[in-house]
């Protein structure tokens, strides 16, 4: 926990194309402004909700000017703005206005009570890791991207299995026939990787998990690697193969293309309310321990 006012400018970012989001964002902006903070809006958010009276900034301008960003939306909104603000080390406060909300941990109904407390300097800070990836074709890099959750190489449409050659730190691991391969951060271990039978990695664990998607050989199991590993995935066989970054952007691949993945030098700071518990999040979102007991951790 940290105390002491260290924020002056607060950026507000909202989930796009979301009916009903204008009112809570406008209310929150007024609440924060009354406390003496400068409030700015992400430019697309300001345009969508039609708000005026506050500066409308691009993500790069937010990174240069704002001390913290409050994100009202779902996990996808956090992933998108998190990647863009990572180079600026802008801390994020997540308010859940989506469905699952693994990384937006403040309920929308509680935001007017909880956000001012965090902005006053009372919070728990957590650094989340990112992946950086590049696609190499004919020996030349043709595309770069950051991923907060995962880098996913997979087949598309009705095409058959793909064959992938995976290497770690220049050492051959395996050739794999499957529907694809997920490279996930600890944050991403509760996303697509989890639905493909991957393990849950605590966010503070320094690791990267490789998770096959519907492998032809059942002996191809997920593996957790050190987070300084350099992973290379080559397209050996198959057609209509794509690589996705947080399932929000993708590019088509060709035979012999290689996707190189490693941990990014950037991290994304999350600011949680005091008393935040990752285990409480798992219980709530994954419906663990449905029958409460006296031994339950009551932290939210």
Swiss-Prot record:
Its cofactor is a divalent metal cation. GO terms for biological process: NAD metabolic process; NADP biosynthetic process. One of its GO terms (molecular function) is ATP binding. One of its GO terms (cellular component) is cytoplasm. Pfam families: NAD_kinase, NAD_kinase_C. It comes from the Bacteria. NAD(+) binds at residues 75-76, 149-150, 177, 179, 190-195, 214, 248. Its EC number is 2.7.1.23. The active site is at 75 (proton acceptor). It catalyses: NAD(+) + ATP = ADP + NADP(+) + H(+). Keywords: ATP-binding, Cytoplasm, Kinase, NAD, NADP, Nucleotide-binding, Transferase. It is an enzyme of class 2 (transferase). It is found in: Cytoplasm. Involved in the regulation of the intracellular balance of NAD and NADP, and is a key enzyme in the biosynthesis of NADP. Catalyzes specifically the phosphorylation on 2'-hydroxyl of the adenosine moiety of NAD to yield NADP. HAMAP family: NAD_kinase. Belongs to the NAD kinase family. This is NAD kinase. The lineage of its organism: Bacteria, Pseudomonadati, Pseudomonadota, Betaproteobacteria, Burkholderiales.
